[in-house]
Amino acid sequence: MTSKTLPFHADTVGSYLRSQPLKEARAKFAAGELSREQLTEVEDQEIAKLVQAQLDAGIQVITDGEYRRAFWHIDFLENLNGIEGYHPEHGYKFNGVETKPYNTRCCGKVSWNPNHPFIEHFKKLKDIIGDRGVVKYTIPSPNQLMYPIQWDTGVYATRAEFAKDVQQAYKDAIKAFYDAGCRYLQFDDVYWGSLCNNHLKPEFEADKAQALENIQVVLAAKPADMVITTHVCRGNFRSTYLLTGAYDPIADALFGQTQYDGYFLEYDDERSGGFEPLKHFSNNPHKGRVVLGLISSKFPELEDKAAIKARIEEATQYLPLEQLCLSPQCGFASTEEGNIMTEAQQWAKVRYVEEIAKEVWGED
């Protein structure tokens, strides 16, 4: 397994619909009817079932489905030193729906927490999977902390000063995951998506430069035999979205200059624009694989296979077929509420990705 073989031509973003026993256990824990130990026991059991379900679906890259999290990002961020979770007045406002009000903010000098629970979570997942598949673990990008609401709390005089500490925390996080045995890590990143959405704002160029610096500095600490990918998202909650905008405003930086081993890109509808920005990858000597998120994880209907293959063919105008891959456009449950579909429909989507990829690229 090297950066030349990962991501696979059929890959996955990471999160899955929470099982009913897990939902019930989390509700009981919130109500004080289950202890933390009892909840962890249920989580362990349900993750073991999820691992088997992924194997049964024929996929090679296995995650824990983010089963231990309420949000794709907050659970990780609030366990860094200097970052706390809190209840704001409002949640994130998606298209026609709002999340529960919970967010993170800086409360002290930021650093890696050597007792961060995600390291133990990864070790448990690795033990469950054994040699049956490739273990993939997802965490939010350091860019998720670059919003003023996150850092501008009076602890740091400037964002640049704050960013330096965030960068070091993430370099230490990479080492901690690596030492725990992680060789496939993914940074999920809505910040790039927000830049696509807000590219006409006066602060855009400064925000883009800071985002690029964060990734370049952090990835410079990556061990040679560790694969780190990114997923660029525009929001995913209850089958709705948060942001719109094509990749054009960020492509020169993200596609042309960052050293990721793979880029999971939303391309399931017109919100993401066309493939032309992919041309910037030709300027990037790292040659990371580009994972086309052509299969929607928001809606249960299966896409037309011929149309998906035609879009893959269209993308080869800008990149060689071997550098391209296929995945769902996002996770199936970026929050514990999950998207509006059944588990059976979810697995049909997963199998569909595998089926199309084998027809296009053959076996990995």
Give residue ranges: language-model regions.
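Domain-level signal for soluble alpha/beta catalytic cores
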Residues: 1-364
